[in-house]
């Protein structure tokens, strides 16, 4: 998802 999404924040 988007890097701005809390769910994907760790995947930035």
UniProtKB/Swiss-Prot annotation:
The keyword Transport applies. Hemolymph. It comes from the Eukaryota. Keywords: Copper, Oxygen transport, Secreted, Transport. The keyword Ribonucleoprotein does not apply. GO terms for biological process: oxygen transport. GO terms for molecular function: oxygen carrier activity. One of its GO terms (cellular component) is extracellular region. Transmembrane segments: none annotated. It is found in: Secreted, Extracellular space. Belongs to the tyrosinase family. Hemocyanin subfamily. Hemocyanins are copper-containing oxygen carriers occurring freely dissolved in the hemolymph of many mollusks and arthropods. This is Hemocyanin subunit 1. The lineage of its organism: Eukaryota, Metazoa, Ecdysozoa, Arthropoda, Crustacea.
